[in-house]
């Protein structure tokens, strides 16, 4: 997403990045289109739930200083809606959780791929997944770690993750 990013916008939006709002709005739109909007929360309510830790995520006040919201945060917050509206994608994430029960990284990658696949308006590339999973302002790049985990998932016949036209996709 081509969102403005300045010191002021970061300060005003923390722990979210400008792109998160575009992602959230498009994700809510995709969920509404699939479910007819029944039972969906507003973007403001989802953000409040993330900040207060009411939808399954840890409250922002309980996070370390510098923590950033990610696509994983949004998936976790909207998991019930995703399960109802995009059953096959939700089940694919579940298969990753079964195959890699002790790896939060693999599970988080699956959640990020799921969000991007649902959106359908942003390439589901390794770089985008890595960027949208960046956990804190002080964290170094996770590109190589994520690349290794993605390769493990692609090479596991029980994980329905593949590549199509340079994008990661749940099959």
Language-model segment annotations:
Residues 129-132, 136-151, 156:
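Extended, regular secondary-structure scaffolds
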Residues 151-167:
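A short, conserved structural fragment
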Residues 24, 109-114:
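Short alpha-helical scaffolding segments that buttress acidic/His motifs in well-ordered protein cores
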Residues 11, 108-110, 156, 165:
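Active-site lining segments that contact anionic ligands and/or coordinate catalytic metals
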Residues 1-105, 119-126, 135-141, 160:
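C-terminal helical "lid" subdomain and adjoining coupling/linker elements of P-loop NTPases
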């Amino acid at each position: 997403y081509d969102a403005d990013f300045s010191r002021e916008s970061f300060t005003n939006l923390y722990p979210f990045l400008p792109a998160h709002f575009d992602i959230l709005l498009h994700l809510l739109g995709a969920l509404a289109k699939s479910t007819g909007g029944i039972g969906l929360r507003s973007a403001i309510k989802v953000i409040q739930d993330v900040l207060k830790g009411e939808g399954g995520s840890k409250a922002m006040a309980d996070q370390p200083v510098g923590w950033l919201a990610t696509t994983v945060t949004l998936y976790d917050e909207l998991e019930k809606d995703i399960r109802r509206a995009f059953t096959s994608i939700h089940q694919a994430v579940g298969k990753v959780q079964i195959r890699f029960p002790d790896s939060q990284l693999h599970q988080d990658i699956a959640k990020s791929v799921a969000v991007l696949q649902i959106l359908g308006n942003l390439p589901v590339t390794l770089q985008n997944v890595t960027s949208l999973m960046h956990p804190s302002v002080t964290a170094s790049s996770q590109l190589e770690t994520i690349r290794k985990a993605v390769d493990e998932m692609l090479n596991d016949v029980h994980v329905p993750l593949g590549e199509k036209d340079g994008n990661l996709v749940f099959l």
